[in-house]
Amino acid sequence: DRSLLSDGERLLAHILNTIDFHSDITVTRGILDVLDHSSPQPLYGSKIAIDATARIAGEQPRPKTNAAKVSRGDEELLQHLRGIDRGFVALRRIFPGCKNPLLLIAIDKENGKNSRYYMDRIDWEALSQGVCVLYDAGIDLADDSLLLWKVFNNTDSSRDVTISGAGIIIDATKKGPADGHIRPWPDEIEMTDEIKKRVNGLLDEFVKDDPDALNMAAFRLPPLLRQPHLARR
């Protein structure tokens, strides 16, 4: 369905409702761009491919699974996690009605705690099935553009994607020696207000003669995630 490519909300819902974590995800290793910073070593690392197409004759059918049962509200779920460890600092759930709902969690990796520490403490019985993405505590879980940037740029698939039963965890946090990552991690790029204004002006100029450009998935994807999130109080 080509129309999915111009409707980010439908596209993401389709992926979450379609994929089987055990048969639709392929991780490869090979040469990476020189600008990559997330792989353990320069110029070499992992890439991920996800098959969200319909199965055809001759292919093994996907296992039939029901939509995840959400037994806890977001506030209750956050407090449950914080009862396990206070380092779980914020939570945001998206598409709870999908077969594989999306759960974003911010974690505090200070005091020697690494990502694996939190992964081992995520209670899948409480979280049910779905996709769980871990972010650093300073990341605003309401900033859709930043969330997408981090999950695409802070991950090496062979290290940062963990499949556990009916769930999958993606570690989109910064990596350091505590995570076994020895390479320097680049600082955040900060733009001045002047640069932001200029970039927004260029975008306005780009779309003014082609209103349909705003229907591109690249522009439509971030707004689809705009739902409330919870943070520690």
Question: Can you name each region flagged by the protein language model?
Answer:
Residues 1-233:
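Charged, compositionally biased interaction regions
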